[in-house]
Amino acid sequence: MRTSYLLLFTLCLLLSEMASGDNFLTGLGHRSDHYNCVRSGGQCLYSACPIYTRIQGTCYHGKAKCCK
């Protein structure tokens, strides 16, 4: 009986850490901004976009530009 309480307690601690973390469950199924940029035909660049292209979004969590 004591062991089952201990297991239940550790399970609750683990689940509470996951919930307060990086929103593990809401992050499932979301694509990275780099993936979305390349999938739409763009390219991720840290420098300015080349001539005849424009900024369509960001890549690498806002550190680079998605040029298309």
Swiss-Prot record:
Localisation: Secreted; Membrane
GO cellular component: extracellular space; membrane; microvesicle; sperm midpiece
GO MF terms held by the record: CCR6 chemokine receptor binding; identical protein binding
Propeptide span(s): 22-32
Assigned protein family: Belongs to the beta-defensin family.
Species name: Macaca mulatta
Signal peptide location: 1-21
One Pfam family matching this protein: Defensin_beta
Tree of life domain: Eukaryota
Principal location listed in the UniProt entry: secreted
Disulfide bonds: C37-C66, C44-C59, C49-C67
Protein name, as recorded: Beta-defensin 1
InterPro entries attached to this UniProt entry: Defensin_beta-like
Keyword terms: Antibiotic, Antimicrobial, Defensin, Disulfide bond, Membrane, Secreted, Signal
Function statement: Has bactericidal activity. May act as a ligand for C-C chemokine receptor CCR6. Positively regulates the sperm motility and bactericidal activity in a CCR6-dependent manner. Binds to CCR6 and triggers Ca2+ mobilization in the sperm which is important for its motility.
